[in-house]
Amino acid sequence: MKKVLALIVAATMGLSSVAFAADAVAPAAAAPAATTTAAPAAAATKAPAKATHHKKAHKKAPAQKAQAAKKHHKATKKAPAQKAQAAKKHHKATKAAPAQKAQAAKKHHKATKPAAAQKAQAAKKHHKATKKAAPAAK
């Protein structure tokens, strides 16, 4: 069990798993070979080698193919959005025109109350001063 752990530690540290397995398994294989036949010894030598061998996952190639396929798709949704945006630019603003007409109508109303006040002011100026003439008569 300690040798298996040593193999795992060695594999994670980046040492050559083949060279380390040959050194670690040779004494372990010699002990069972002395008591048993050569077949279990061969099985003992193959087991650690399979445990340290790591196969690479070959899933990147299909993902890369799908990524390349994504790049070459045409963007069909952007074209209608652009057409709608151009249509928005050419619409006439119908609500703004009546508001402008109402504003122009406000400017042309006659101010009737200031005219009445001016008329009253003119009437004040033309009153005769009767009190001033009386002291001059004395």
UniProtKB/Swiss-Prot annotation:
Regions of compositional bias (Basic residues) in chain numbering: 51-77, 122-131
Propeptide, chain numbering: 22-85
Subcellular location: Periplasm
Keyword Signal: yes
Chain's gene name: asr
UniProt xrefs under InterPro entries: Acid_shock
The name this protein goes by in its record: Acid shock protein
Principal location: periplasm
UniProt superkingdom: Bacteria
Keyword entries, A-Z: Periplasm, Signal
Pfam families: Asr
Family stated for the protein in its record: Belongs to the Asr family.
Keyword Nucleus: no
Protein purpose: Required for growth and/or survival at acidic conditions.
